[in-house]
């Protein structure tokens, strides 16, 4: 009988929780601002972790770029705090990636809504 979750999935879930708390409470860099950890993917050997993040004002590319620079600069500090919070033999190297899926999802939703509205307007004319 196989396990429901792989160890890397469980570690990724715990990393997501811990990184979110660390970003909220410990990291004081003003460039980062309001950041949300949307997902974490961990390699099978737990050596690398991709941390997908979104920012509150994600329509401004300058804010996103500054926030990503701040996260990269704070990466070693975050990793140190993770080492204190989690009991792992190997603590993954952190790579922060801006998650555009939320923005793209909203854009697609708006496109679908516009198509539905234009289709309804056409049917009212007929």
Curated annotation (Swiss-Prot):
Tell me where on the tree of life, at the top rank, the source sits.
Bacteria
Q: Name one GO molecular function term.
A: ribosomal small subunit binding
An example of a Gene Ontology cellular component annotation for this protein is: cytosol
What subcellular locations does the record give? Cytoplasm
Q: Quick check: keyword Nucleotide-binding in the entry?
A: no
List GO BP terms, alphabetically: maturation of SSU-rRNA
Q: Which Pfam family, an example, fits this chain?
A: RBFA
Gene3D superfamilies hit by this protein: 3.30.300.20
Keyword Aminoacyl-tRNA synthetase listed? The answer is no
Keyword terms, alphabetized: Cytoplasm, Ribosome biogenesis
Function in brief: One of several proteins that assist in the late maturation steps of the functional core of the 30S ribosomal subunit. Associates with free 30S ribosomal subunits (but not with 30S subunits that are part of 70S ribosomes or polysomes). Required for efficient processing of 16S rRNA. May interact with the 5'-terminal helix region of 16S rRNA.
Its assembly, as annotated, is: Monomer. Binds 30S ribosomal subunits, but not 50S ribosomal subunits or 70S ribosomes.
What is stated as this protein's family in its record? Belongs to the RbfA family.
Provide the protein name: Ribosome-binding factor A
Source organism per entry reads Haemophilus ducreyi (strain 35000HP / ATCC 700724)
Q: What gene name is listed for this protein?
A: rbfA
């Amino acid at each position: 009988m196989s396990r429901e979750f792989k160890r890397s999935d469980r570690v990724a879930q715990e990393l997501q929780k811990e990184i979110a708390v660390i970003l909220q409470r410990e990291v004081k860099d003003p460039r980062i601002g309001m950041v949300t950890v949307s997902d974490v993917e961990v390699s099978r050997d737990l050596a690398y972790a991709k941390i997908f993040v979104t920012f509150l004002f994600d329509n401004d590319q300058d804010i996103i770029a500054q926030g990503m620079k701040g996260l990269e600069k704070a990466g070693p500090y975050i990793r140190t705090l993770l080492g204190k919070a989690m009991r792992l033999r190997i603590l993954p190297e952190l790579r922060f990636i801006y998650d555009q899926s939320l923005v793209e999802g909203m854009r697609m939703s708006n496109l679908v809504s516009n198509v539905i509205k234009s289709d309804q307007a056409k049917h009212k004319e007929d």
